[in-house]
């Protein structure tokens, strides 16, 4: 089961998904540069991810490893959105998304292929 991850936790996960196993010290450097977080803030968020089972800590050097994939989190978040905002109806989500903008021919073809693959 994939757990609910908050935006701050997703910032940590994005680093791990992009870079693979990463030392907590390096994660703190990245978040300081990109987000402006202090080292303490970063370590607090890393601890939350550890407590939730989203990452594991490896020694030496406090190396963090993602235990859930980006795809698992995306699927979980999408299911939550569909249930919360669209009464569990994925077609209502798709209709809402499609109503937001005009699709290119390439986007329409990709959607057609996706639908055909589900049939």
Residue ranges and their predicted role:
Residues 5-8, 60-78:
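Short, cationic-aromatic polyanion-contact patches
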Residues 10-15:
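Pre-recognition alpha-helix immediately N-terminal to the DNA-recognition helix
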Residues 16-20:
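Short helix-to-turn junction characteristic of helix-turn-helix DNA-binding domains
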Residues 22-31:
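Short acidic, hydrophobic short linear motifs in intrinsically disordered regions
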Residues 46-50:
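Basic amphipathic alpha-helical segments that dock to polyanions
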Residues 53:
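Glycine-centered, phosphate/nucleic-acid-interacting loop/turn motifs that mediate DNA/RNA or nucleotide
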Residues 57, 66, 105:
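Short beta-strand "wing" residues that participate in macromolecule-binding interfaces
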Residues 79-119:
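Amphipathic alpha-helical dimerization/coiled-coil segments
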